[in-house]
Amino acid sequence: MIYAELAGGLGNQMFVYAFARALGLRCGEGVTLLDRQDWRDGAPAHTACALEALAISPGVRILSEPQFAKTHLPRQNAAKALMIKYEQRRGLLARDWQPFERRMAPLLNMIGLHFATDGYTPAHRGPSRDFLAWGYFQSERYFADAAGTIRRELRAKTPPTGSFAAAIAAARWPVAVHLRRGDYLKPENEILQVCTPEYYAAAVAAVAAAKPEAELFVFTDDEPWAREHLPTAGLPATILPQGAAANDLALMQRCRGFVLSNSTYSWWAQYLADAPDKIVWAPDRWYAHTKRSDLYLPGWRRIATQTHP
């Protein structure tokens, strides 16, 4: 059995699902996702499991038993705890851990653990009866061989309806603009403070230059700020009230253009979009410091970002 621990909001949970599901298909094994409720105490970035609103495979089980790994996978869980402690003591967010995690992967895979917080670290199943995955797995390379399956299974079970869905359908060239503020503005998340007002101004100007007929649909966790400060470059703009994560994601997917924040949530919106002529504008850095990202895809138009003071 392949086990993977869920973390973060819907976008991060989708990457964990995609990694584990693709590995399960490769190995012909079942998948259980461990919904760590205990992580959410005092940690709002770790939200409730939202995957059940998506068309995930009925063969993927979601288990809400916080101590499962500690009780049933003691060897893998102990190795995971040591890796977390080592990286946290040396600055989990401030450093690029991919080279270290790649060096450790063969040994960890042999004992039934895959640990990957940064970039792409290939996973090898190893001989252990049970296999535990912990990390963020934020790279399409983890599931490229199962991309069709992943795209089908990570769509909303219920297609969006209502006035906003109708407005997007009626627009000549709808563009989803994702503006994330909230937890990104906290001092401890300085590494995520990339998408400044200047970034959005430049990105929207690029949209207007490329597609003068574009209409903006703004998805944000800070509607008042967006109404007062978000530049539109003269394009018509609709600022949507924040709704359920899966429904908003499904609305974004119906657009043809995408202005991304450095968020996995907007990454999935563009990835799952069907428009053959879609255009993606993204910040040229995913992190404010030296950490690298494997999230960039061919064809994206990168917008220069200022170094955070």
Predicted region positions:
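Extreme N-terminal starter segment of soluble prokaryotic enzymes
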Residues: 1-3
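A short, glycine/small-residue-rich beta-strand->loop->alpha-helix junction that serves as a flexible
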Residues: 5-15
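Short, solvent-exposed loop/turn segments at secondary-structure junctions
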Residues: 9-11, 37-41, 137-141, 180-184, ...
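Donor-binding and catalytic core of enzymes assembling or modifying cell-surface/extracellular glycoconjugates
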Residues: 10, 205-290
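Histidine-anchored nucleotide/phosphate-binding helix
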Residues: 13-25, 200-208
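A short beta-strand-loop structural module common to alpha/beta enzyme folds
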Residues: 27-41
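Secretory-pathway luminal glycosyltransferase catalytic domains
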Residues: 46-206, 210-211
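Leloir-type glycosyltransferase catalytic cores
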Residues: 288-309
